[in-house]
Protein backbone atom coordinates (compact mmCIF):
# COMPACT_ATOMS: atom_id res chain seq x y z
CA UNK A 1 0.00 0.00 0.00
CA UNK A 2 3.10 2.20 -0.14
CA UNK A 3 5.60 3.14 -2.80
CA UNK A 4 9.35 2.52 -2.49
CA UNK A 5 11.99 4.06 -4.73
CA UNK A 6 15.77 3.95 -4.48
CA UNK A 7 18.66 5.16 -6.63
CA UNK A 8 22.41 4.63 -6.72
CA UNK A 9 24.36 5.95 -9.68
CA UNK A 10 26.21 8.84 -11.24
CA UNK A 11 23.47 11.48 -10.96
CA UNK A 12 22.41 13.52 -7.96
CA UNK A 13 20.09 11.07 -6.27
CA UNK A 14 17.44 13.24 -4.64
CA UNK A 15 15.90 14.68 -7.85
CA UNK A 16 15.77 11.16 -9.34
CA UNK A 17 14.07 9.79 -6.24
CA UNK A 18 11.54 12.63 -6.10
CA UNK A 19 10.55 12.00 -9.71
CA UNK A 20 10.25 8.28 -9.01
CA UNK A 21 8.09 8.87 -5.95
CA UNK A 22 5.76 11.10 -7.96
CA UNK A 23 5.11 8.14 -10.26
CA UNK A 24 4.38 5.92 -7.26
CA UNK A 25 2.03 8.31 -5.52
CA UNK A 26 -1.01 6.30 -6.61
CA UNK A 27 0.15 3.67 -4.09
CA UNK A 28 -0.27 6.02 -1.12
CA UNK A 29 -0.26 9.73 -0.37
CA UNK A 30 -0.65 10.14 3.38
CA UNK A 31 2.98 11.22 3.70
CA UNK A 32 6.30 11.10 1.87
CA UNK A 33 9.97 11.12 2.72
CA UNK A 34 13.49 10.30 1.62
CA UNK A 35 16.91 9.59 3.07
CA UNK A 36 20.38 10.15 1.68
CA UNK A 37 23.97 10.31 2.91
CA UNK A 38 25.53 13.77 3.10
CA UNK A 39 28.99 14.54 4.49
CA UNK A 40 29.13 11.16 6.22
CA UNK A 41 25.77 11.46 7.98
CA UNK A 42 22.23 10.47 7.20
CA UNK A 43 20.03 13.19 5.75
CA UNK A 44 16.33 12.49 6.27
CA UNK A 45 13.38 14.65 5.25
CA UNK A 46 9.72 13.70 5.78
CA UNK A 47 6.47 15.56 5.19
CA UNK A 48 2.75 14.99 5.61
CA UNK A 49 0.75 14.88 2.40
CA UNK A 50 1.75 14.55 -1.22
CA UNK A 51 5.18 14.23 -2.84
CA UNK A 52 4.98 17.88 -3.94
CA UNK A 53 5.11 18.86 -0.26
CA UNK A 54 8.32 16.89 0.13
CA UNK A 55 9.77 18.42 -3.03
CA UNK A 56 8.95 21.92 -1.79
CA UNK A 57 10.61 21.25 1.57
CA UNK A 58 13.87 20.38 -0.21
CA UNK A 59 14.11 23.45 -2.43
CA UNK A 60 16.70 25.16 -0.21
CA UNK A 61 18.78 22.03 0.39
CA UNK A 62 21.95 21.18 -1.53
CA UNK A 63 22.55 17.48 -0.94
CA UNK A 64 25.36 16.22 -3.17
CA UNK A 65 24.70 12.50 -2.88
CA UNK A 66 24.56 9.70 -5.43
CA UNK A 67 22.47 7.46 -3.16
CA UNK A 68 18.94 7.95 -1.82
CA UNK A 69 15.85 6.00 -0.88
CA UNK A 70 12.31 7.37 -0.78
CA UNK A 71 8.82 6.39 0.23
CA UNK A 72 5.24 7.49 -0.25
CA UNK A 73 2.92 6.13 2.42
CA UNK A 74 -0.56 4.77 2.90
CA UNK A 75 -0.84 4.26 6.64
CA UNK A 76 -1.41 0.78 8.08
CA UNK A 77 0.32 1.14 11.48
CA UNK A 78 0.30 4.59 13.06
CA UNK A 79 -1.59 7.68 11.95
CA UNK A 80 -0.14 9.93 9.21
CA UNK A 81 2.39 12.07 11.09
CA UNK A 82 5.95 13.13 10.36
CA UNK A 83 7.28 10.72 12.98
CA UNK A 84 5.37 7.82 11.43
CA UNK A 85 6.38 8.71 7.87
CA UNK A 86 9.24 6.86 6.18
CA UNK A 87 12.20 6.54 6.02
CA UNK A 88 12.72 5.28 9.55
CA UNK A 89 16.10 5.42 11.25
CA UNK A 90 17.64 3.66 14.20
CA UNK A 91 18.13 5.53 17.46
CA UNK A 92 21.73 6.46 16.57
CA UNK A 93 20.86 7.52 13.00
CA UNK A 94 23.24 5.07 11.36
CA UNK A 95 20.77 3.48 8.93
CA UNK A 96 17.52 4.39 7.19
CA UNK A 97 14.78 2.04 5.99
CA UNK A 98 11.80 2.35 3.66
CA UNK A 99 9.21 -0.40 3.92
CA UNK A 100 6.02 -1.57 2.26
CA UNK A 101 3.89 -4.23 3.91
CA UNK A 102 3.14 -5.41 7.41
CA UNK A 103 5.52 -6.90 9.97
CA UNK A 104 3.19 -9.25 11.79
CA UNK A 105 5.52 -9.90 14.74
CA UNK A 106 6.62 -6.30 15.24
CA UNK A 107 5.22 -6.16 18.79
CA UNK A 108 7.38 -9.07 19.90
CA UNK A 109 10.44 -7.63 18.15
CA UNK A 110 9.82 -4.18 19.59
CA UNK A 111 9.43 -5.62 23.10
CA UNK A 112 12.74 -7.42 22.72
CA UNK A 113 14.53 -4.29 21.52
CA UNK A 114 13.00 -2.18 24.29
CA UNK A 115 14.28 -4.71 26.80
CA UNK A 116 17.73 -4.21 25.27
CA UNK A 117 17.49 -0.48 25.90
CA UNK A 118 16.60 0.61 22.36
CA UNK A 119 14.50 3.79 22.09
CA UNK A 120 11.74 4.14 19.48
CA UNK A 121 10.42 7.35 17.96
CA UNK A 122 7.31 6.20 16.05
CA UNK A 123 4.23 3.98 16.35
CA UNK A 124 4.93 2.02 13.17
CA UNK A 125 5.93 -1.58 12.57
CA UNK A 126 8.47 -0.34 10.01
CA UNK A 127 10.82 1.26 12.54
CA UNK A 128 11.49 -2.20 13.95
CA UNK A 129 13.45 -3.07 10.79
CA UNK A 130 15.87 -0.17 11.21
CA UNK A 131 16.30 -0.71 14.94
CA UNK A 132 16.75 -4.47 14.58
CA UNK A 133 19.33 -4.08 11.82
CA UNK A 134 21.31 -1.51 13.83
CA UNK A 135 21.17 -3.73 16.91
CA UNK A 136 22.73 -6.59 14.95
CA UNK A 137 25.21 -4.41 13.10
CA UNK A 138 26.61 -3.07 16.38
CA UNK A 139 27.68 -6.62 17.18
CA UNK A 140 28.87 -7.89 13.80
CA UNK A 141 29.89 -4.75 11.85
CA UNK A 142 28.92 -6.85 8.81
CA UNK A 143 26.44 -5.03 6.57
CA UNK A 144 25.22 -7.98 4.51
CA UNK A 145 24.99 -10.56 7.28
CA UNK A 146 23.23 -8.07 9.55
CA UNK A 147 20.66 -7.44 6.82
CA UNK A 148 20.18 -11.17 6.21
CA UNK A 149 19.76 -11.83 9.94
CA UNK A 150 17.26 -8.99 10.28
CA UNK A 151 15.15 -10.37 7.44
CA UNK A 152 15.18 -13.81 9.02
CA UNK A 153 13.54 -12.35 12.15
CA UNK A 154 10.64 -10.69 10.32
CA UNK A 155 7.25 -12.33 9.84
CA UNK A 156 4.71 -11.01 7.38
CA UNK A 157 4.69 -9.65 3.86
CA UNK A 158 7.08 -6.83 3.11
CA UNK A 159 9.53 -5.21 0.76
CA UNK A 160 12.17 -2.80 1.96
CA UNK A 161 15.22 -0.76 1.10
CA UNK A 162 18.06 0.13 3.49
CA UNK A 163 21.07 2.43 3.44
CA UNK A 164 23.85 2.88 6.02
CA UNK A 165 25.81 6.07 6.59
CA UNK A 166 29.16 4.23 6.52
CA UNK A 167 28.39 2.59 3.16
CA UNK A 168 27.46 5.36 0.72
CA UNK A 169 27.98 3.08 -2.27
CA UNK A 170 25.60 0.26 -1.24
CA UNK A 171 21.82 0.01 -1.38
CA UNK A 172 20.24 -3.08 0.18
CA UNK A 173 16.74 -4.29 -0.59
CA UNK A 174 14.55 -7.34 -0.06
CA UNK A 175 11.10 -8.73 -0.81
CA UNK A 176 8.84 -11.16 1.01
CA UNK A 177 5.44 -11.58 -0.67
CA UNK A 178 5.50 -7.90 -1.67
CA UNK A 179 6.61 -6.43 -5.00
CA UNK A 180 10.04 -4.93 -5.54
CA UNK A 181 11.60 -4.42 -8.97
CA UNK A 182 15.25 -3.72 -9.76
CA UNK A 183 16.11 -1.41 -12.65
CA UNK A 184 19.55 -1.95 -14.18
CA UNK A 185 20.94 1.05 -16.02
CA UNK A 186 24.28 2.20 -17.41
CA UNK A 187 26.32 3.05 -14.33
CA UNK A 188 23.16 3.42 -12.26
CA UNK A 189 20.62 1.15 -10.62
CA UNK A 190 17.12 1.58 -9.22
CA UNK A 191 14.68 -0.16 -6.92
CA UNK A 192 10.95 0.51 -7.04
CA UNK A 193 7.60 -0.96 -6.10
CA UNK A 194 6.57 -0.52 -9.75
CA UNK A 195 8.98 -0.57 -12.69
CA UNK A 196 7.12 2.26 -14.38
CA UNK A 197 8.68 4.61 -11.84
CA UNK A 198 12.11 4.25 -13.47
CA UNK A 199 11.29 3.34 -17.09
CA UNK A 200 12.48 6.67 -18.45
CA UNK A 201 15.96 5.66 -17.23
CA UNK A 202 16.08 1.95 -18.09
CA UNK A 203 13.92 -0.88 -19.38
CA UNK A 204 16.21 -3.63 -18.06
CA UNK A 205 14.62 -5.15 -14.98
CA UNK A 206 14.81 -7.95 -12.46
CA UNK A 207 11.88 -8.72 -10.18
CA UNK A 208 12.79 -9.92 -6.71
CA UNK A 209 10.93 -13.10 -5.85
CA UNK A 210 9.62 -13.72 -2.36
CA UNK A 211 12.47 -14.50 0.02
CA UNK A 212 15.15 -12.72 -2.01
CA UNK A 213 17.45 -9.80 -1.24
CA UNK A 214 19.69 -7.75 -3.48
CA UNK A 215 22.93 -5.85 -2.97
CA UNK A 216 22.96 -2.85 -5.27
CA UNK A 217 26.45 -1.44 -5.69
CA UNK A 218 27.84 1.59 -7.47
CA UNK A 219 28.99 0.85 -11.00
CA UNK A 220 28.75 -2.94 -10.91
CA UNK A 221 26.13 -5.63 -11.28
CA UNK A 222 23.39 -6.21 -8.78
CA UNK A 223 23.93 -9.31 -6.66
CA UNK A 224 20.89 -11.34 -5.65
CA UNK A 225 20.65 -13.85 -2.79
CA UNK A 226 18.06 -15.68 -0.80
CA UNK A 227 17.64 -14.64 2.82
CA UNK A 228 20.19 -17.30 3.84
CA UNK A 229 22.73 -15.59 1.52
CA UNK A 230 22.84 -18.30 -1.12
CA UNK A 231 23.66 -16.59 -4.44
CA UNK A 232 20.89 -16.61 -7.02
CA UNK A 233 21.35 -16.11 -10.74
CA UNK A 234 18.50 -14.03 -12.13
CA UNK A 235 17.98 -13.21 -15.80
CA UNK A 236 17.62 -9.60 -16.87
CA UNK A 237 14.39 -8.93 -18.72
CA UNK A 238 13.73 -6.15 -21.18
CA UNK A 239 10.24 -4.75 -20.71
CA UNK A 240 8.36 -3.74 -23.82
CA UNK A 241 6.20 -1.03 -22.30
CA UNK A 242 7.26 2.52 -21.49
CA UNK A 243 6.10 5.24 -19.13
CA UNK A 244 4.02 6.76 -21.93
CA UNK A 245 0.69 7.83 -20.52
CA UNK A 246 2.16 8.86 -17.21
CA UNK A 247 1.24 12.50 -17.85
CA UNK A 248 -2.25 13.97 -18.22
CA UNK A 249 -1.85 14.90 -21.90
CA UNK A 250 -4.03 17.98 -21.60
CA UNK A 251 -6.74 16.49 -19.41
CA UNK A 252 -7.48 17.99 -16.02
CA UNK A 253 -7.29 14.63 -14.26
CA UNK A 254 -5.81 11.21 -14.92
CA UNK A 255 -9.18 9.60 -14.32
CA UNK A 256 -10.79 11.69 -17.04
CA UNK A 257 -7.96 10.89 -19.44
CA UNK A 258 -8.27 7.20 -18.68
CA UNK A 259 -12.03 7.25 -19.20
CA UNK A 260 -11.52 8.73 -22.66
CA UNK A 261 -8.75 6.23 -23.46
CA UNK A 262 -11.20 3.33 -23.19
CA UNK A 263 -12.23 3.25 -26.86
CA UNK A 264 -8.56 2.89 -27.81
CA UNK A 265 -7.94 0.13 -25.25
CA UNK A 266 -11.04 -1.78 -26.34
CA UNK A 267 -10.17 -1.38 -30.01
CA UNK A 268 -6.71 -2.81 -29.39
CA UNK A 269 -8.16 -5.90 -27.72
CA UNK A 270 -11.04 -6.59 -30.11
CA UNK A 271 -8.81 -6.30 -33.17
CA UNK A 272 -6.20 -8.52 -31.55
CA UNK A 273 -8.63 -11.30 -30.68
CA UNK A 274 -11.50 -11.03 -33.21
CA UNK A 275 -11.37 -11.22 -36.99
CA UNK A 276 -13.57 -8.90 -39.11
CA UNK A 277 -16.29 -11.57 -39.25
CA UNK A 278 -16.47 -11.67 -35.46
CA UNK A 279 -14.81 -15.05 -35.01
CA UNK A 280 -12.49 -15.29 -32.03
CA UNK A 281 -8.85 -15.71 -32.93
CA UNK A 282 -6.83 -18.81 -32.12
CA UNK A 283 -4.36 -16.42 -30.43
CA UNK A 284 -6.80 -16.00 -27.56
CA UNK A 285 -5.71 -18.56 -24.94
CA UNK A 286 -3.91 -20.50 -27.65
CA UNK A 287 -3.13 -24.02 -26.48
CA UNK A 288 -5.12 -23.53 -23.28
CA UNK A 289 -7.23 -26.68 -22.60
CA UNK A 290 -10.60 -25.03 -21.97
CA UNK A 291 -12.40 -28.22 -22.95
CA UNK A 292 -10.94 -29.96 -19.88
CA UNK A 293 -12.93 -27.90 -17.37
CA UNK A 294 -16.53 -28.28 -16.28
CA UNK A 295 -16.68 -25.45 -13.74
CA UNK A 296 -14.93 -22.18 -12.99
CA UNK A 297 -13.88 -20.51 -9.73
CA UNK A 298 -13.16 -16.77 -9.98
CA UNK A 299 -11.45 -14.97 -7.10
CA UNK A 300 -10.85 -11.21 -6.95
CA UNK A 301 -11.26 -8.02 -4.88
CA UNK A 302 -12.99 -4.68 -5.40
CA UNK A 303 -13.70 -3.72 -8.99
CA UNK A 304 -12.06 -6.94 -10.19
CA UNK A 305 -14.63 -8.87 -8.17
CA UNK A 306 -17.40 -7.02 -10.00
CA UNK A 307 -15.79 -8.00 -13.31
CA UNK A 308 -15.75 -11.61 -12.17
CA UNK A 309 -19.38 -11.36 -11.09
CA UNK A 310 -20.38 -10.21 -14.57
CA UNK A 311 -18.37 -13.09 -16.03
CA UNK A 312 -20.48 -15.49 -13.98
CA UNK A 313 -23.68 -14.21 -15.60
CA UNK A 314 -22.23 -14.25 -19.11
CA UNK A 315 -20.40 -17.58 -19.01
CA UNK A 316 -23.28 -19.42 -17.37
CA UNK A 317 -25.67 -18.05 -20.00
CA UNK A 318 -23.37 -18.90 -22.90
CA UNK A 319 -22.11 -22.35 -21.94
CA UNK A 320 -24.19 -23.48 -18.93
CA UNK A 321 -21.28 -24.45 -16.68
CA UNK A 322 -21.25 -23.35 -13.04
CA UNK A 323 -19.16 -20.28 -12.21
CA UNK A 324 -18.37 -19.47 -8.58
CA UNK A 325 -17.20 -15.95 -7.74
CA UNK A 326 -15.40 -15.36 -4.46
CA UNK A 327 -14.16 -12.28 -2.62
CA UNK A 328 -10.46 -12.99 -2.23
CA UNK A 329 -10.25 -11.81 1.38
CA UNK A 330 -12.90 -14.40 2.33
CA UNK A 331 -11.90 -17.24 0.02
CA UNK A 332 -8.85 -18.39 1.98
CA UNK A 333 -10.85 -18.66 5.21
CA UNK A 334 -13.55 -20.99 3.93
CA UNK A 335 -13.39 -24.44 2.45
CA UNK A 336 -14.86 -23.62 -0.94
CA UNK A 337 -15.57 -26.61 -3.15
CA UNK A 338 -12.96 -27.07 -5.86
CA UNK A 339 -13.38 -30.06 -8.17
CA UNK A 340 -10.78 -31.89 -10.23
CA UNK A 341 -12.01 -30.12 -13.36
CA UNK A 342 -12.17 -26.62 -11.90
CA UNK A 343 -10.56 -23.76 -13.80
CA UNK A 344 -9.33 -21.17 -11.30
CA UNK A 345 -9.29 -17.55 -12.46
CA UNK A 346 -7.61 -14.78 -10.46
CA UNK A 347 -8.22 -11.16 -11.42
CA UNK A 348 -6.08 -8.23 -10.24
CA UNK A 349 -5.29 -5.05 -12.13
CA UNK A 350 -1.88 -4.66 -10.49
CA UNK A 351 -1.16 -8.35 -10.14
CA UNK A 352 0.01 -7.60 -6.59
CA UNK A 353 -3.26 -7.62 -4.61
CA UNK A 354 -2.35 -9.36 -1.36
CA UNK A 355 -5.60 -11.27 -0.83
CA UNK A 356 -5.68 -12.44 -4.44
CA UNK A 357 -2.11 -13.70 -4.19
CA UNK A 358 -3.09 -15.51 -1.00
CA UNK A 359 -5.87 -17.18 -3.00
CA UNK A 360 -3.26 -18.25 -5.57
CA UNK A 361 -1.34 -19.95 -2.76
CA UNK A 362 -4.53 -21.68 -1.65
CA UNK A 363 -5.23 -22.95 -5.17
CA UNK A 364 -1.68 -24.29 -5.35
CA UNK A 365 -1.99 -25.91 -1.93
CA UNK A 366 -5.14 -27.65 -3.08
CA UNK A 367 -3.42 -28.77 -6.29
CA UNK A 368 -5.79 -27.09 -8.72
CA UNK A 369 -4.68 -28.25 -12.14
CA UNK A 370 -4.77 -24.89 -13.90
CA UNK A 371 -4.83 -21.26 -12.76
CA UNK A 372 -5.53 -18.43 -15.20
CA UNK A 373 -4.62 -14.86 -14.31
CA UNK A 374 -5.99 -11.59 -15.66
CA UNK A 375 -3.91 -8.50 -14.92
CA UNK A 376 -2.23 -5.42 -16.37
CA UNK A 377 1.40 -5.85 -15.26
CA UNK A 378 3.70 -8.35 -16.92
CA UNK A 379 6.28 -8.67 -14.13
CA UNK A 380 3.71 -8.88 -11.32
CA UNK A 381 3.57 -11.73 -8.83
CA UNK A 382 0.24 -12.86 -10.25
CA UNK A 383 1.46 -12.90 -13.85
CA UNK A 384 4.53 -14.91 -12.97
CA UNK A 385 2.74 -17.24 -10.56
CA UNK A 386 -0.16 -18.52 -12.68
CA UNK A 387 -0.14 -21.10 -15.46
CA UNK A 388 -1.35 -18.63 -18.08
CA UNK A 389 -2.07 -14.90 -17.94
CA UNK A 390 -4.29 -12.68 -20.05
CA UNK A 391 -2.94 -9.13 -20.05
CA UNK A 392 -5.27 -6.14 -20.13
CA UNK A 393 -2.91 -4.12 -22.36
CA UNK A 394 -4.59 -1.03 -20.95
CA UNK A 395 -1.40 0.94 -20.43
CA UNK A 396 -0.54 2.60 -17.17
CA UNK A 397 -3.59 3.55 -15.10
CA UNK A 398 -2.82 6.21 -12.49
CA UNK A 399 -6.24 7.27 -11.24
CA UNK A 400 -7.00 5.29 -8.09
CA UNK A 401 -10.57 4.60 -9.21
CA UNK A 402 -10.15 2.05 -12.00
CA UNK A 403 -11.67 2.83 -15.38
CA UNK A 404 -9.92 1.51 -18.49
CA UNK A 405 -8.39 -1.46 -16.66
CA UNK A 406 -11.85 -2.50 -15.48
CA UNK A 407 -13.47 -2.35 -18.91
CA UNK A 408 -10.49 -4.27 -20.34
CA UNK A 409 -11.15 -6.94 -17.70
CA UNK A 410 -14.80 -7.09 -18.74
CA UNK A 411 -13.89 -7.48 -22.39
CA UNK A 412 -11.36 -10.27 -21.77
CA UNK A 413 -13.87 -12.14 -19.60
CA UNK A 414 -16.56 -11.77 -22.26
CA UNK A 415 -14.08 -13.10 -24.84
CA UNK A 416 -13.36 -16.00 -22.51
CA UNK A 417 -17.06 -16.82 -22.49
CA UNK A 418 -17.11 -16.62 -26.27
CA UNK A 419 -14.08 -18.91 -26.51
CA UNK A 420 -15.78 -21.42 -24.22
CA UNK A 421 -18.72 -21.65 -26.62
CA UNK A 422 -16.32 -23.15 -29.15
CA UNK A 423 -14.87 -25.80 -26.84
CA UNK A 424 -18.31 -26.59 -25.38
CA UNK A 425 -20.16 -26.38 -28.75
CA UNK A 426 -22.99 -24.25 -27.37
CA UNK A 427 -23.33 -21.66 -30.17
CA UNK A 428 -23.63 -22.03 -33.90
CA UNK A 429 -21.02 -20.31 -36.05
CA UNK A 430 -23.60 -17.68 -37.00
CA UNK A 431 -24.46 -16.97 -33.36
CA UNK A 432 -20.79 -16.90 -32.39
CA UNK A 433 -19.91 -14.39 -35.11
CA UNK A 434 -22.90 -12.21 -34.23
CA UNK A 435 -21.54 -11.92 -30.70
CA UNK A 436 -18.07 -11.10 -32.00
CA UNK A 437 -19.37 -8.46 -34.39
CA UNK A 438 -21.24 -6.85 -31.52
CA UNK A 439 -17.97 -6.57 -29.61
CA UNK A 440 -16.17 -5.15 -32.66
CA UNK A 441 -18.61 -2.23 -32.55
CA UNK A 442 -17.58 -1.31 -29.01
CA UNK A 443 -14.90 1.34 -29.77
CA UNK A 444 -17.24 3.35 -32.00
CA UNK A 445 -20.14 3.01 -29.55
CA UNK A 446 -17.92 4.16 -26.68
CA UNK A 447 -16.92 7.26 -28.62
CA UNK A 448 -20.58 8.03 -29.29
CA UNK A 449 -21.42 7.56 -25.63
CA UNK A 450 -18.60 9.81 -24.43
CA UNK A 451 -19.90 12.58 -26.68
CA UNK A 452 -23.23 12.57 -24.79
CA UNK A 453 -23.30 15.82 -22.79
CA UNK A 454 -26.21 14.56 -20.70
CA UNK A 455 -23.73 12.24 -18.98
CA UNK A 456 -22.13 15.27 -17.34
CA UNK A 457 -25.25 17.28 -16.56
CA UNK A 458 -26.84 14.93 -14.04
CA UNK A 459 -24.52 16.06 -11.23
CA UNK A 460 -25.88 19.62 -11.42
CA UNK A 461 -29.23 18.29 -10.24
CA UNK A 462 -28.09 15.73 -7.69
CA UNK A 463 -24.79 17.06 -6.30
CA UNK A 464 -26.31 17.84 -2.89
CA UNK A 465 -27.56 14.29 -2.35
CA UNK A 466 -25.53 12.14 0.02
CA UNK A 467 -27.24 8.77 -0.45
CA UNK A 468 -28.11 6.86 -3.61
CA UNK A 469 -29.65 3.49 -4.35
CA UNK A 470 -28.61 1.60 -7.50
CA UNK A 471 -30.88 -1.05 -8.99
CA UNK A 472 -30.16 -3.51 -11.77
CA UNK A 473 -31.08 -6.96 -12.98
CA UNK A 474 -29.12 -9.75 -14.62
CA UNK A 475 -26.12 -8.30 -16.56
CA UNK A 476 -26.80 -4.84 -15.19
CA UNK A 477 -26.58 -5.89 -11.54
CA UNK A 478 -22.75 -6.31 -11.43
CA UNK A 479 -22.42 -3.09 -13.42
CA UNK A 480 -24.58 -1.28 -10.87
CA UNK A 481 -22.32 -2.66 -8.14
CA UNK A 482 -19.33 -1.13 -9.88
CA UNK A 483 -21.12 2.19 -10.44
CA UNK A 484 -22.04 2.37 -6.76
CA UNK A 485 -18.43 1.65 -5.79
CA UNK A 486 -17.20 4.44 -8.05
CA UNK A 487 -19.59 6.91 -6.43
CA UNK A 488 -18.32 5.89 -2.99
CA UNK A 489 -14.66 6.03 -4.00
CA UNK A 490 -14.48 9.54 -5.40
CA UNK A 491 -17.76 11.32 -4.61
CA UNK A 492 -17.72 10.16 -0.96
CA UNK A 493 -21.46 9.49 -0.90
CA UNK A 494 -23.29 6.46 0.40
CA UNK A 495 -24.28 4.36 -2.59
CA UNK A 496 -26.00 1.03 -2.06
CA UNK A 497 -26.68 -1.46 -4.83
CA UNK A 498 -29.38 -4.12 -4.90
CA UNK A 499 -30.82 -6.55 -7.43
CA UNK A 500 -34.00 -4.80 -8.48
CA UNK A 501 -36.10 -7.83 -7.57
CA UNK A 502 -34.88 -7.61 -3.97
CA UNK A 503 -36.35 -4.18 -3.29
CA UNK A 504 -39.55 -5.57 -1.80
CA UNK A 505 -37.49 -7.79 0.54
CA UNK A 506 -36.26 -4.93 2.68
CA UNK A 507 -34.40 -2.13 0.86
CA UNK A 508 -37.61 -0.38 -0.18
CA UNK A 509 -37.91 0.70 3.47
CA UNK A 510 -35.09 3.15 2.72
CA UNK A 511 -37.19 4.99 0.14
CA UNK A 512 -38.76 8.29 1.13
CA UNK A 513 -39.91 11.36 -0.74
CA UNK A 514 -37.17 12.53 -3.09
CA UNK A 515 -34.82 9.57 -2.52
CA UNK A 516 -32.56 9.33 -5.60
CA UNK A 517 -32.69 5.88 -7.19
CA UNK A 518 -30.43 5.09 -10.16
CA UNK A 519 -31.71 2.28 -12.37
CA UNK A 520 -29.64 0.57 -15.06
CA UNK A 521 -32.15 -0.77 -17.57
CA UNK A 522 -29.77 -2.01 -20.26
CA UNK A 523 -30.61 -5.72 -20.18
CA UNK A 524 -33.47 -6.11 -22.65
CA UNK A 525 -34.46 -9.55 -21.37
CA UNK A 526 -35.57 -8.05 -18.04
CA UNK A 527 -36.52 -4.56 -19.19
CA UNK A 528 -40.21 -4.90 -18.31
CA UNK A 529 -39.26 -6.17 -14.86
CA UNK A 530 -37.09 -3.07 -14.38
CA UNK A 531 -39.97 -0.81 -15.38
CA UNK A 532 -42.14 -2.54 -12.78
CA UNK A 533 -39.52 -1.92 -10.10
CA UNK A 534 -39.29 1.73 -11.10
CA UNK A 535 -43.04 2.05 -10.68
CA UNK A 536 -42.75 0.59 -7.18
CA UNK A 537 -40.18 3.13 -6.00
CA UNK A 538 -42.01 5.96 -7.80
CA UNK A 539 -45.10 5.02 -5.80
CA UNK A 540 -42.99 5.84 -2.71
CA UNK A 541 -42.10 9.23 -4.26
CA UNK A 542 -38.52 8.32 -5.15
CA UNK A 543 -36.66 10.40 -7.72
CA UNK A 544 -35.57 8.01 -10.49
CA UNK A 545 -32.51 8.45 -12.70
CA UNK A 546 -32.90 5.92 -15.52
CA UNK A 547 -29.98 4.72 -17.62
CA UNK A 548 -31.40 2.98 -20.67
CA UNK A 549 -30.72 2.28 -24.33
CA UNK A 550 -31.73 4.67 -27.08
CA UNK A 551 -34.41 2.16 -28.08
CA UNK A 552 -36.04 2.48 -24.66
CA UNK A 553 -37.25 6.06 -24.93
CA UNK A 554 -40.47 5.09 -23.17
CA UNK A 555 -38.48 5.02 -19.93
CA UNK A 556 -38.95 8.80 -19.81
CA UNK A 557 -42.59 8.31 -18.90
CA UNK A 558 -41.72 6.63 -15.59
CA UNK A 559 -38.46 8.37 -14.60
CA UNK A 560 -37.33 11.88 -13.67
CA UNK A 561 -33.94 12.02 -15.40
CA UNK A 562 -32.71 9.94 -18.31
CA UNK A 563 -29.30 9.00 -19.68
CA UNK A 564 -29.45 7.17 -22.99
CA UNK A 565 -26.83 4.67 -24.11
CA UNK A 566 -26.27 3.66 -27.76
CA UNK A 567 -28.03 0.47 -28.80
CA UNK A 568 -25.65 -2.48 -28.76
CA UNK A 569 -25.32 -6.24 -28.67
CA UNK A 570 -26.18 -7.65 -25.25
CA UNK A 571 -22.56 -8.72 -24.64
CA UNK A 572 -21.30 -5.21 -25.36
CA UNK A 573 -23.86 -3.36 -23.25
CA UNK A 574 -22.21 -3.97 -19.83
CA UNK A 575 -19.11 -2.10 -20.96
CA UNK A 576 -21.10 0.88 -22.22
CA UNK A 577 -23.12 1.09 -19.01
CA UNK A 578 -19.91 0.82 -16.99
CA UNK A 579 -18.65 3.99 -18.66
CA UNK A 580 -21.88 5.76 -17.71
CA UNK A 581 -21.22 4.88 -14.07
CA UNK A 582 -17.66 6.19 -14.33
CA UNK A 583 -18.77 9.52 -15.75
CA UNK A 584 -21.55 9.85 -13.17
CA UNK A 585 -19.03 9.39 -10.34
CA UNK A 586 -16.46 11.69 -11.93
CA UNK A 587 -18.92 14.55 -12.50
CA UNK A 588 -20.39 14.21 -9.00
CA UNK A 589 -16.92 14.29 -7.41
CA UNK A 590 -15.94 17.26 -9.56
CA UNK A 591 -19.08 19.15 -8.56
CA UNK A 592 -18.35 18.47 -4.90
CA UNK A 593 -14.78 19.71 -5.28
CA UNK A 594 -13.26 16.36 -4.29
CA UNK A 595 -9.80 15.06 -5.14
CA UNK A 596 -10.39 12.99 -8.28
CA UNK A 597 -7.20 11.01 -8.86
CA UNK A 598 -6.19 10.38 -5.25
CA UNK A 599 -9.38 10.01 -3.18
CA UNK A 600 -9.10 9.99 0.57
CA UNK A 601 -8.07 6.83 2.41
CA UNK A 602 -7.55 4.82 -0.78
CA UNK A 603 -4.54 3.43 -2.61
CA UNK A 604 -4.32 2.02 -6.11
CA UNK A 605 -2.51 -1.21 -5.30
CA UNK A 606 -3.64 -3.06 -2.17
CA UNK A 607 -0.53 -5.02 -1.27
CA UNK A 608 -1.42 -5.75 2.37
CA UNK A 609 -4.22 -7.93 3.68
Curated annotation (Swiss-Prot):
UniProt xrefs under CDD domains: GFAT, SIS_GlmS_GlmD_1, SIS_GlmS_GlmD_2
Cell compartments where the protein resides: Cytoplasm
An individual GO BP term: carbohydrate metabolic process
Top EC class for this record: transferase
Keywords: Aminotransferase, Cytoplasm, Glutamine amidotransferase, Repeat, Transferase
Domain Glutamine amidotransferase type-2: 2-219
One example GO MF annotation: glutamine-fructose-6-phosphate transaminase (isomerizing) activity
Active-site residues (renumbered): 2 (nucleophile), 604 (for fru-6p isomerization activity)
Domain named SIS: residues: 280-426, 458-599
InterPro entries: GATase_2_dom, GFAT, GFAT_N, GlmS/AgaS_SIS, GlmS/FrlB_SIS, Ntn_hydrolases_N, SIS_dom, SIS_dom_sf
EC number: 2.6.1.16
GO cellular component annotations of the record: cytosol
Assembly mode: Homodimer.
NCBIfam families named among the record's database cross-references: glmS, PRK00331.1
UniProt xrefs under HAMAP family: GlmS
Role played: Catalyzes the first step in hexosamine metabolism, converting fructose-6P into glucosamine-6P using glutamine as a nitrogen source.
Protein name, per record: Glutamine--fructose-6-phosphate aminotransferase [isomerizing]
Species name: Chlamydia abortus (strain DSM 27085 / S26/3)
Amino acid sequence: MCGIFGYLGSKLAIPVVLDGLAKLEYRGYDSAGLASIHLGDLFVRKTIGRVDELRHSLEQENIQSLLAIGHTRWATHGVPTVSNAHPHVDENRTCAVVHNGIIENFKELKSFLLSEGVSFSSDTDSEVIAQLFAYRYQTTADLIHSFSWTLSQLQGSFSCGLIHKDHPDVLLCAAQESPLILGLGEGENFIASDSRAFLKHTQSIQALASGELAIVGLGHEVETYNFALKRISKPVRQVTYTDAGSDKQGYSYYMLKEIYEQPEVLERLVHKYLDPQGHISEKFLQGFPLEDFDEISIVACGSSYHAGFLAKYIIESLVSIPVHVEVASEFRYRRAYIGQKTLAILISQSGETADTLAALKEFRRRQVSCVLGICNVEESALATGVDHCLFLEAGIEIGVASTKAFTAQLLLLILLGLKLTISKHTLSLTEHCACGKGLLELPELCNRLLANENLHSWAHTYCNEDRFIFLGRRLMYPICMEAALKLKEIAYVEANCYPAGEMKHGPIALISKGSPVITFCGDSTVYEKMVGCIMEVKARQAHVIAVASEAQEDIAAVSDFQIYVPNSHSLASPILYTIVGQIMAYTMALKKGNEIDCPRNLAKSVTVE
